[in-house]
């Protein structure tokens, strides 16, 4: 809860600073001089409310959505030795990480992957793919589980949701400024908001949202290094490196993780060139090198 309060306070400060900065640079006067009557303070508050509402709502239903989108079966009563081992391992790792035991599940996928999600570190879900259980050693799976437990213990799901809330706020804010400017200045519409406003706003939201996702993905990549460190601490550096090397050997396999969960999986796929800016995970080679330097 303290993390949420501090982050919300920080984001409120960002909104206020943005409002003051725009006023100091005479942006209000510029818009008024061009016939655009827009209260930027009210617009910022409006965008912040809706920007954070969408992000936090997604966070609160993340466990339910993850189970539905991946067909994850939560283990309540273990039926096999794999399931028994999974429960015991997650319980041990959770205890060592200082969090409550999350729900544990298996999702039907040939690819080697795992994810963690949940709105609270003491009310989370950790799931692993059937393919990973079949092809990875117990030490490697334990390292992957430790990585996911690291995400939970670090509060990464909450942090990323709040970062997305900030991004949503400013995408909505600047898209509406652009929409008003196009409508009033370029199309000279003086009576209410015309079609140009709505078209320009939607177009700007799509473009700005795409560009701003690079910011969210940058935060996501930073989280992965921290989760790898947690995995190494809980399961051993050698096991964590071995798990990442095994993942690297299977990079040719398609990743079928839903887009909404890609940032929370251990395997984010491969991208080249400028597309690397929009990767949720650093390249596996970089993650392995970071662990080796850590020792």
From Swiss-Prot:
Cofactor note: Binds 1 zinc ion per subunit.
Subcellular localization(s) per the UniProt record: Cell inner membrane
GO terms, molecular function: metalloendopeptidase activity; zinc ion binding
BP-aspect Gene Ontology terms: proteolysis
Active site: 148
Sorted UniProt keywords: Cell inner membrane, Cell membrane, Hydrolase, Membrane, Metal-binding, Metalloprotease, Protease, Stress response, Transmembrane, Transmembrane helix, Zinc
EC number(s) per entry: 3.4.24.-
Record keyword Zinc present: yes
Pfam families in alphabetical order: Peptidase_M48
Chain sites annotated for binding Zn(2+): 147, 151, 224
CC per GO annotation: plasma membrane
Bilayer topology annotation: Multi-pass membrane protein
InterPro entries registered for this protein in UniProt: HtpX_protease (IPR050083), Pept_M48_protease_HtpX (IPR022919), Peptidase_M48 (IPR001915)
Keyword tRNA-binding assigned: no
Transmembrane segments: 4-24, 42-62, 158-178, 195-215
Family: Belongs to the peptidase M48B family.
Name used for this protein in its record: Protease HtpX
Source organism of this protein record: Pseudomonas fluorescens (strain SBW25)
Species lineage: Bacteria, Pseudomonadati, Pseudomonadota, Gammaproteobacteria, Pseudomonadales
Gene: htpX
């Amino acid at each position: 809860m303290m993390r949420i309060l501090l982050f919300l306070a920080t984001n409120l400060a960002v909104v206020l600073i943005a409002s003051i900065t725009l006023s100091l640079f005479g942006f209000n006067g510029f818009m008024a001089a061009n016939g655009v009557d827009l209260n930027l303070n009210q617009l910022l508050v409006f965008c912040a409310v809706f920007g954070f509402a969408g992000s936090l709502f997604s966070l609160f239903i993340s466990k339910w959505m993850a189970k539905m989108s991946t067909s994850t079966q939560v283990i309540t009563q273990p039926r096999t030795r794999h399931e028994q081992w999974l429960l015991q391992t997650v319980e041990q790792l959770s205890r060592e990480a200082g969090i409550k035991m999350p729900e544990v599940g298996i999702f039907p996928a040939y690819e080697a992957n795992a994810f963690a999600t949940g709105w609270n570190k003491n009310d989370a879900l950790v799931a692993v793919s059937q393919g990973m259980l079949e092809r990875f050693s117990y030490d490697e799976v334990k390292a992957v589980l430790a990585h996911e437990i690291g995400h939970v213990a670090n509060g990464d799901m909450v942090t990323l949701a709040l970062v997305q809330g900030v991004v949503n706020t400013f995408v909505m804010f600047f898209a509406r400024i652009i929409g008003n400017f196009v409508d009033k200045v370029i199309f000279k519409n003086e009576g209410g908001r015309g079609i140009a406003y709505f078209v320009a706003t939607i177009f700007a939201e799509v473009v700005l949202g795409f560009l701003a996702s690079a910011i969210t993905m940058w935060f996501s990549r930073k989280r992965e290094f921290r989760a790898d460190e947690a995995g190494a601490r809980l399961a051993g550096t050698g096991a964590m490196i071995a798990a990442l090397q095994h993942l690297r050997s299977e990079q040719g396999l398609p990743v079928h993780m839903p887009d909404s969960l890609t940032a929370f999986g251990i395997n984010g796929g491969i991208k080249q060139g400028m597309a690397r800016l929009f990767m949720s995970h650093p390249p596996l080679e970089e993650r392995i090198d970071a662990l080796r330097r850590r020792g």
